[in-house]
From Swiss-Prot:
Keyword set, alphabetical order: Sporulation, Toxin, Virulence
Name of this protein: Parasporal crystal protein Cry18Ba
GO BP, sorted A to Z: sporulation resulting in formation of a cellular spore; symbiont-mediated killing of host cell
Pfam family for this entry, one: Endotoxin_N
Job of this protein: Binds to the brush border membrane vesicles of scarab larvae and damages the gut wall somehow to allow the vegetative cells of P.popilliae to enter the hemolymph.
GO MF terms, alphabetically ordered: signaling receptor binding; toxin activity
SUPFAM superfamilies assigned to the protein according to its UniProt record, in alphabetical order: delta-Endotoxin (insectocide), middle domain, delta-Endotoxin (insectocide), N-terminal domain, Galactose-binding domain-like
InterPro entries to which the protein is assigned, alphabetical: Galactose-bd-like_sf, Pest_crys, Pest_crys_dom-III, Pest_crys_dom_I, Pest_crys_N_sf, Pest_cryst_cen_dom_Cry2A/18, Pest_cryst_cen_dom_sf
Family: Belongs to the delta endotoxin family.
Amino acid sequence: MNNNGNALSRTALTPTNNKVISGDLVTNGLPPIDNNIICSNGFMPINVTRKNPFRKRTTQEFIREWTEWKENSPSLFTAPIVGVVTSTLLEALKKQVQSRLLLLMTNLLFPNNSTSTMEEILRATEQYVQEQLDTVTWNRVSQELEGLKNNLRTFNDQIDDFLQNRVEISPTAMIDSINTMQQVFVNRLPQFQLSDYQLLLLPLFAQGATLHLTFIRDIIINAGEWNIPEAQLNTCKRYLKQYVAQYSNYALSTYEGAFRARFYPRATLENMLQFKTFMTLNVLDLVSIWSLLKYMNLYISTSANLYNIGDNKVNEGEYSISYWPFFNSYIQTKSNYVLSGVSGYAIRWYYLNTFFGEYIQDNLYNIIASYVGGVNGPKIGVQLSTTELDKQIKQQARAGMPTGLDDLSFNCTLRNPTTVPYFACNFQELTSSGTAGTGGFIRSDVFRSEDNICGLGTGYASAWTSYPDYYITNISATVQVDGINIDITPLCFGEDRAITSTHGVNKVIAVYNRKANIAGTNQNGTMIHQAPNDGTGFTVSPLHLASFTHPSEAHIQENYGNSGDSLRLTGPTTAITYMLSGDGRTIYKLVLRVSGVITRITAKVRGNSIGYLEYINTVDNNQGITDNGSKFQDFEFRPTITIDAQTPIVLEFSATSNFDLMNLIFIPYYDTPIY
């Protein structure tokens, strides 16, 4: 018998198996009933493997992928166009020539000269936040969308006319068109910032701001072809920096204020994670791109995380909002390693009710994620060993309450964690009397890769949660509340701090990230970053390090608009190593995005210094953006570097106060940032 959650036949008070390798999909006698449909069982997303992350992709591909995702994800409140826009922007930034990004964005957001797609974003937000615009405001916003659409069409038509008949349109006429469109954006965007509806309108604002920023960027990139005078070009460069900061600060402060307002003083972690995921897809992903629009040939390799969390309601509990910073870092434990599997200790208990008959209750006592290199994450749930748990279960069984039990423990291992990762999961609690009996509940905590389905209750996994271009990079969980105070002092980066509960695991959590350019792993299991082979620049998350000298002096600092969180360093000196792999042909410049006051940064490649930066102070010298307290600036090392196979990049820091390492950016040596 396979006891990984598929077989419901029971044994008389004796577990049939203490550890089962579960990977097959088997049906069983009790019909699975899906109470939380997220994806149809037959839907297989395109991005199920990490293969060829640098291939060129078309907008049509993104439209197809996100449309199929939405068709198979009816319970999610996100319009597919927001994913299409983000994916298209990321693809456009990879290309050396994307001359008219505004035209592409206009056609996506106003297809067939209609505002219906933008209105769909607003309706989806209304559904999620459970608020609605009043009729007057809705009509006002609709009119603003109509006006914006018409002005964008007029401007794009004027550019077409100029390019086709350049002798008939003077540079003065071009400048007049640009100034008119600029004034439209300045006047229209405040209509998506109405004081009573700031959160509700924020996704629309994010799309409008993206249109404005790509408009300015197009002018700068095409200044020569469009005969833009140098004075006007310099004005546009100033505008791009100004509005990136202005729009970023508004979006970030609105998100932060809404998060605190919704979840103060206490809330469930499920609600917090769902809000973070919704806002990342609809707003924060775009914000993270805005400050990188100044680079013209860049592959953004990481993203903020998305999440899926179980819908279990037993002993759910609420947490103080002060718990969130700890929890945000906890679910990213081992984020610099490559996930290789997950295991858990689970028991299915059978009980008999005199009036309603037999019912089932599943208990997941603990769960542990595993990573390449033989590395394990912290044990979440009951901290007893397997032997001790077996003894406890037998004692409980002999007490006479249950009529039987099955051991549903699982031990899942990916065949090839680097290229064939988990891409989807199914977390649900089945409470139908026809499935679990009256008063019963059955768990389904299942993970899916291209060639494997594994976890607790695989026979009930009729629904899957996935996101185009995202992979499951970590697995965590919440515990059932039992009165034990959880230690929420800041986690050191990579710290294995157990989360204890005598009642076991409540909700399993899957963490999704876009990270795809993984060349392999180091001997310790940490990831090696693959550089593009076509001369494109790329980014590296500061959290994806290979090693560092003072782990107790590093923490995860949450950032909302930074393609992921930062590494906060608190010691006077530290050295961090990142391992990269490339073909050795592209010459790069290294740019560091940092926040704080730093005495000195020295960069070494293959053990040789390539230069240093001294006396950095982003309190005074920054890009004008405040991201959860971080004011940042990009600093470039002048010497160039090449990246061969297994190239270590070592960063040595000296500082007298805390500072944040927010991003590593490798740009082709011939590219100059816009500002």
